[in-house]
Amino acid sequence: MAAAPSATAPKHNYTLGTNASQLELYKYLKTVPPIPELRQAVTIKKYEEASVDDTLYPLIDEHQIIMVVGAFFGDEGKGKTVDAVARHPACTCVARVNSGENAGHTVFDDIGRKYVFNLAPSSLLTPNTRNYVSSECVMDPISFMEREIGQFIKSNMPYKDKLFVGNVFVVTPYHKLLDLLGSAPNSSTLKGMSPIHASKVTKRGIRLDHIFNDEGVLRARLAKDMDTYYGLLKVKGLTDKDVVRRCQEENADGVERVPGYVVDFARAENKIDYLVKLYTERVKNNKDFPRRCDVTHELRAALARGEKLLLEGPQSYWLSNAREKFWESTTSADTTAGGLLASAQFNFQRYKVLVINVHKAPGSSRVGIGANPSSFVPQDYYSAQDIKTLEALPKGGCVDFDKIQNFFYTKAFNTESKTFNGIYEPLEYEDATGKYNIGVAMSIASARHHGECGAVTKKPRVCGFFDCVLHFEVNAVQGPYLSISAVDRGDDYDRIGITIAYVYYDVGNKMVDANGRVYKNGDIIKAGDPVPCEMALYHCYPIVKVINGWKGAPIAASKRRPNEPLPKGVCEFIANVEFFTGAKVISIGNGPRGSDIIYLKQ
C-alpha cells in the first residue's frame, strides 16, 4: 500500500520499494480493530453449470430491452456477454446510444480475424443483427472510417446492411487537441470526450447532418466552436508549431495517440478550409460511409414489431458523469443503465428492461486518474512515473507471478493471527532486479500476467481486489444480475481477496465532510454504507477478506471438461460476492473466446 494522494491527486515521488511513509501508514492501519464481517460465516452454495438456453435466454425472453453495462471502471470484458445476448434469436437490434470512441472491444470472427471496435457495436460480426450508432453518441467520423470501417473494407466483409449511423455529434481535430493540451497526464484517452461534450451542452459545434447540408452553415458553426481552441492557445501562449511539437511528443513511443489528420489540422494555415475539405472528401462523398438513419425511430419500430433490443453500454457505472462519487475522474456521458435508457429515448413505462452488470475478477482494474480504494497501488502510480505502456514497466522485474501472488496472500496477509484486520503488511518482495513493495510487485505482476492495459490507451491498468463496497451500490441501482468475467485467472492464485470495507485515514489527521457526514481517521465504510465522494475515497484503504483459491483445479475452458463440478474455491468466491453485495451471479468467464462462459443454474 502507499500513502494516499490528496483530493486533487498531484504527482508523487513513488518508489518501487517500501518507503518510510508506507511504514508509517501501516503503523496506524494495523491498529484498526477487526470488523466482525471478516470472520462471518458465509454459506457456500453449490453452484452448478447450466446451458445458456436454461439461464440467460429465459431472462431475455421476459424482457424487451436488454442492457449489458460495466459495473466497475470499464474494461470489464462486456463484449463476451454482449455477443451471448446478441445471439438470442429474437435479439435483432444492437445499439450504442451514448459516449464515443473512448470505449474499446476486441472481437474475433469465425475464422480468427481480429476486429477492434471503439464506437461501433461489438456485435457487428454476429449474424442476423442490425447495429446502430445513435444520435446521442459522439463520433470522430475520420477515425471511425479509418480504424473501424477500414477493418471491414480490408477484409472484404460486408457491413452496409448491418450498420446504421444517426445524427451524431462530431468530434473534430480541435476537440482532440483541446483534450491533449488541457488534460493532466493519464487523465484522458485523448479522444476529445470532454471538449465535444462541452460543445454539445453549449449548443456549439456540428452534428453529422451539418456535413451533408449547407456549407456556409457548416463553416459558420465550425468557426464559432473553434473560438474555444484559439482561446486556449492564447491563454497558454502556444503557436501552431508548439501544438505540432506536443503531438509528436505524445506519439514518440510508437503508439499513435494523436492521429495524423489531427496533426495536419494543427499545421493547416486555414483550418476551416482544411476541415470542410476533410469532411467533404472522407465523409459526405465517401461511398464507404455507413448508411444514415433516424436511429431512435428505427429502434422504436423494431420494438413495436416485437423484436428485442440490446443496448451495449460503454465504460461503466462508476465512470458515469452522472455519478457524484468519482465525478472529477469520469467520462463525460451518463454510462449507467439509467443513462443508456434515457439516451435511447424510449418510453420506459412501456417496456420491460433487463440489466446485466459485468465485473471482472481477479484483477479488477481501472485506467486513468482518480480514487481506487481497492487497488494494489495508488491510481496515479504509473502516470506519476510516465509509464504509458506495459513495455515501459521495469524490465525483468516482477515477472514471477506465481511467487508474487503466493508471497502476497500467505505473508503480507497474516490471516492466522487473531488480530488480523484485513489489511496487508507492506512487506518487500525481492527478485534479481531489486526490492519491491508487495503492492507494487502485485500490481506490476498482475498487469504483465493478465495483459492488463487499456483497450484504447494501451496504458497499464491498475489492478486490485473485487470491491464489494462499490458493487453494493451498483447492485442497489441497477442489479441484481451480475456476470463476472476472467474468473479463470483464479486458476493461478493460491488465495483470492475481496474488499468488504474501507478504513479512512489521513496522515495529516484531516477530516472530509461528504454529504453531511464527517469522515475522520479510523472510520469504517462497509458494503451497504453510503459511499463518500472522491475527496474521502482518496484516503480510504481496503479491508480484505481472504478466501481460498482453486489452484490445482482449473476452470479455464482449455483445461476443464464441460459440466464438471465447480471447485469449492470458485463457489466460495461467488457466494461471498453475492453475500456482501446482494448480487445474483448468472455467469462467469473462463477463457478468451466468446463461448468461454460458464452459466450458473438459477
From Swiss-Prot:
Keywords: Cytoplasm, GTP-binding, Ligase, Magnesium, Metal-binding, Nucleotide-binding, Purine biosynthesis. Its cofactor is Mg(2+). GO terms for biological process: 'de novo' AMP biosynthetic process; IMP metabolic process; post-transcriptional regulation of gene expression; purine nucleotide biosynthetic process. Homodimer. PANTHER family: ADENYLOSUCCINATE SYNTHETASE. HAMAP family: Adenylosucc_synth. This is Adenylosuccinate synthetase. It comes from Trypanosoma brucei brucei (strain 927/4 GUTat10.1).
